[in-house]
Amino acid sequence: MKAQEIQQQLESYNYMDAKVTKIDSKYFGDEVTVVFQNENKEIEMQFLGCSKISFSTTVEDREKPLKLVEDKDLNYNIKKIEVTDCIQDKTILLNCTVDVFPLNLEICCNTISVFKK
């Protein structure tokens, strides 16, 4: 699926201010999963064949270990998702940036799948 099609699919889920419930990485970063909940639906984004994964946040966000925070008290809500095509070593890949204030996520991968859980 091309970047523009994925972007349209994401926008159809009305992701703005959706609560992120899970971010997971497997196989040394080859696969990344982001799950968000909106309008009583869980939407899963799967990133496969990842060659770049970048997380950044504020120092204040990590003052208290997140494992000590109850899920209901986590406030990671999506502000923006942008999917674009990118070229890396002459290969066309997908680049996705997710603004989950105060966390920013950027993933460059071969495939992005989006579906309801």
What are these regions (language model features)?
Residues 1-117:
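Surface-exposed, interaction-prone regions used to assemble/regulate multi-protein complexes
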